[in-house]
């Protein structure tokens, strides 16, 4: 699967937020000025047009979840097809990705690390090995670290880090057994208020 391999800190500066959650692992501020865009003229922030704001928000969310453009557009089409609020549907679809669920359960420090665990066949879903990061997790599905992967230092470190963060209410995790359950779809109030999904809906609705 294609994925972005370029400089990630530069993208975080472009969007003005810690896209890849590096600050949860190491001090990002010491090496990355999030309030300043990259480049020689990064400090000169002009007023964005409505289209510019919509595009920036789409890029931000796409990069947070590690999804390329074509796949992100497909998520939007599916969200628009479903009943209910299209923007909220979009966020729920992104939250159902296996790599995201592995991250939310605290088995990985970042979504990128979670993608690695999935791709390297370290994850069981309902008792079966799944190595597709975009695999859709449904309510009541179980996600377990494979026995031979349970001693990986990065998983142990991630669980320790997760103890310092607010725990998602839509997943249940047994840190000792290294297994979890996706209890329900997250509600909009469960997710980051820094995301304005309506801007994405406006962008794709044109």
Swiss-Prot record:
Belongs to the universal ribosomal protein uS4 family. GO terms for cellular component: small ribosomal subunit. CDD domains: S4. One of the primary rRNA binding proteins, it binds directly to 16S rRNA where it nucleates assembly of the body of the 30S subunit. With S5 and S12 plays an important role in translational accuracy. Keywords: Ribonucleoprotein, Ribosomal protein, RNA-binding, rRNA-binding. GO terms for biological process: ribosomal small subunit biogenesis; translation. The keyword Lipid metabolism does not apply. Part of the 30S ribosomal subunit. Contacts protein S5. The interaction surface between S4 and S5 is involved in control of translational fidelity. HAMAP family: Ribosomal_uS4_B. GO terms for molecular function: rRNA binding; structural constituent of ribosome. SUPFAM superfamilies: Alpha-L RNA-binding motif. Residues 96-156 form the S4 RNA-binding domain. This is Small ribosomal subunit protein uS4. It comes from Pseudoalteromonas translucida (strain TAC 125).
